């Protein structure tokens, strides 16, 4: 769908020079002299990088519609994660690169939203939190309570994270997947 610059809004997805970008920020400028333009901050959906771009009033932009599907992780295979569509149970490989940093904290059957463009997966939106059991934790040193004492633990999926020293093996913890930090202990 073709848009004029005044129709561009935050959250839209645009096709610019063959790449897909999500609009992060827009600023419409109408100077006293000369023609109007719009300054934008765009996030590349395939490369996960951001650019700032200015579009002149006469330019036409192409808006695209993305399909979002609720899917769950089945298993990993080579460089792919095999997802299953929650509606029709179709299995589809998706590149690990979309969730590479949080993969060690994801269990099988974790629900996620997978974004598609022209039938191909272009992004994965993971949940904000993961609840996992601690499988290995060293004992905290007695008296080591100055500041925010932390230790390294391993969770059931094999991921390692820093947690407060009171967390023990067998505890179930909540991890924030946006920044890979410990949130709290949860009851079993």
Curated annotation (Swiss-Prot):
Entry GO terms, CC: cytoplasm
Taxonomy, superkingdom: Bacteria
Keyword ATP-binding: no
Database matches in InterPro entries: Elong-fact-P_C, NA-bd_OB-fold, Rib_uL2_dom2, Transl_elong_fac_P/YeiP, Transl_elong_KOW-like, Transl_elong_P/YeiP_cen, Transl_elongation_fac_P, Translation_prot_SH3-like_sf
Example GO BP: peptide biosynthetic process
Entries under Gene3D superfamilies matching the protein: 2.30.30.30, Nucleic acid-binding proteins (2.40.50.140)
Entry GO MF terms: translation elongation factor activity
Protein's cellular compartments: Cytoplasm
Similarity-based family: Belongs to the elongation factor P family.
Function of the protein: Involved in peptide bond synthesis. Stimulates efficient translation and peptide-bond synthesis on native or reconstituted 70S ribosomes in vitro. Probably functions indirectly by altering the affinity of the ribosome for aminoacyl-tRNA, thus increasing their reactivity as acceptors for peptidyl transferase.
Record-given protein name: Elongation factor P
Gene behind the chain: efp
